[in-house]
Amino acid sequence: MGLQQEISLQPWCHHPAESCQTTTDMTERLSAEQIKEYKGVFEMFDEEGNGEVKTGELEWLMSLLGINPTKSELASMAKDVDRDNKGFFNCDGFLALMGVYHEKAQNQESELRAAFRVFDKEGKGYIDWNTLKYVLMNAGEPLNEVEAEQMMKEADKDGDRTIDYEEFVAMMTGESFKLIQ
């Protein structure tokens, strides 16, 4: 991630200083630009200007940032930001949540790159159709042939019968897989 400068949240917080203290974890996980962006979105939902957002608004707030968690992920996030179950959370809780989110996203990215390299042993930048089909039908929770082909067709956006890294990520994260049931 490189050298990060110490970031103070004070300039972006309009509520009592004691509820907006920077933690080292936040400064390591989020850039100044990210903090500014997230603080701006947080303030849009802070209807009363008191530095608090209703926990029920978390889904809309995340959606505005392009993050669409599942219901169970959302429930877990709500517990994390509203530990006292008061029905609201402050900017520090939200920024800490976003720091954790970014850390998990980075970990997932490195895991996906490593998995892709396992299948792209020759470093061609893609996985051929037959290799991927074999893996999908024989590893983990195996798919049947129809399911494997459907999944690959959804993932192979350019129709070249290979799966490049971007297509692989979309397939593995469920962004392209819509199995017809």
UniProtKB/Swiss-Prot annotation:
An individual GO BP term: microtubule cytoskeleton organization
Species per Swiss-Prot/TrEMBL record: Homo sapiens (Human)
A Pfam family hit: EF-hand_7
Residues binding Ca(2+): D156, D158, D160, T162, E167
GO cellular component: cytoplasm; nucleus
GO molecular function: calcium ion binding; enzyme regulator activity
SMART domains named in the record: EFh
Record keywords, A-Z: Calcium, Cytoplasm, Metal-binding, Nucleus, Repeat
Residue stretches making up the EF-hand domain: 33-68, 69-104, 107-142, 143-178
Protein name according to UniProt: Calmodulin-like protein 6
Assigned protein family: Belongs to the calmodulin family. Calglandulin subfamily.
Record flagged with keyword Calcium: yes
Location of this chain's protein in the cell: Cytoplasm; Nucleus
Tissue: Expressed in prostate, thymus, heart, skeleton muscle, bone marrow and ovary.
